[in-house]
Amino acid sequence: VETLLRRPILRIVPVGLMLIALQRTAFANAHPFGVRLQIVLALCAAAGVAGGAERGAWMGFVLGIMFDLGNGFPLGQHGLAYGLAGFVGGLVNAVAVDPHWWLKLIFVALGGAVGEFSVPVVQTFVSDGGWQGQRLGSILPVIAVSCAALSFLFTHLGRWCLAIRKKTWKPRNE
């Protein structure tokens, strides 16, 4: 039973439900510079930083499917975007084995921007929306900065959700 409770999916689903509820209620009226904040997207990118590209993409896809089911979007629309955000965030591990805090911050911001950019691209293919009326030049910087600001908290939360222990380095001579 204890090993079952340590499975990542049993951690991701409740945390994802809480963040989706927060995004739809508390952050629904928070529009800095006319842009709706995407806290679930920030968690997906931060989970990629904490767990690597593959785990970040997996967690982003799961949270994106949950977001689509809860908001009535076509199934997979945000799953693809959030999975891409987690993958891009996880690419930090290709640059450095144990990245500094500022490198993590940059990749969470980059993952959030790429994920937000991919939403209208996917909308073009799956629905009537898409590029019409999108102000991506003003949306992407706000999303990137908000994801970067949330990266300090969400990197640790993403590591916990993915059931990853912090790396410990031991000398080889012991």
Regions found by a protein language model. Name each.
Residues 1-174:
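Terminal, non-globular segments
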